[in-house]
């Protein structure tokens, strides 16, 4: 049996596959708000009755958020449940929205993190994450999944804070 060296197209496909495999965004939480984020988070979240938090659920699956349009009211506490019903990991990413909210807690399969600043939230296939937050700044913000090609295939949405 004669072995042939790998061809350029084969190597290119292999390299592209490895690049995509390494591009998963992962969950990124900052313990201190980066520049541009809402400040005084601890005081904001401690002043709220979390028993009154409004529940909102978003389902993520292959190339869609359901619902893909979300609306929140400033100063109202929310418990956002993100259910990944897909077969692959998805992210819930909205840089502008993350900068405009005070986060009390993020709960993932690994446990809970108190008062983080969200940078990116990745939900593995079949798992559920919960974000408890208060919207602080009004605006309309883009929402997208930042896994490779997901937003290109329509996994986008919008978040409005009134």
Give names to the regions the model predicted:
Residues 98-109:
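Short aromatic-acidic-glycine turn motif
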Residues 2-12:
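Bacterial N-terminal signal peptides that target proteins for export
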Residues 24-39, 64, 115-162:
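Extracellular/periplasmic metallocenter environments
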Residues 108-116:
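Short beta-strand and strand-turn-strand segments in soluble, beta-rich domains
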Residues 29-56:
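N-terminal low-complexity, Pro/Thr/Ser-rich intrinsically disordered segments
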Residues 19-22:
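C-terminal motif of bacterial Sec signal peptides marking the signal peptidase cleavage site
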Residues 47-78:
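N-terminal edge beta-strand
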Residues 68-93, 128-137, 161:
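Beta-strand cores of secreted/periplasmic/IMS beta-sandwich domains, seen most often
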């Amino acid at each position: 049996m004669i072995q042939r060296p790998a061809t350029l197209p084969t190597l290119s496909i292999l390299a592209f596959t490895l690049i995509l495999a390494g591009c998963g965004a992962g969950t990124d939480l900052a313990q201190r708000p980066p520049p541009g984020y809402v400040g005084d988070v601890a005081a904001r979240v401690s002043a709220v009755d979390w028993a009154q938090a409004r529940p909102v659920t978003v389902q993520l699956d292959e190339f869609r958020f359901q619902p893909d349009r979300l609306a929140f009211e400033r100063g109202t506490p929310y418990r956002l449940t993100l259910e990944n019903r897909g077969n692959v990991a998805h992210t819930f990413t909205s840089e502008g929205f993350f900068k405009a909210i005070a986060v009390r807690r993020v709960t993932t399969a690994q446990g809970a993190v108190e008062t983080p600043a969200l940078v990116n939230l990745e939900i593995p296939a079949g798992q559920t994450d919960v974000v408890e937050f208060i919207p602080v700044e009004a605006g309309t913000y883009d929402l997208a999944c930042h896994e490779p090609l997901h937003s290109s295939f329509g996994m986008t949405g919008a978040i409005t804070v009134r």
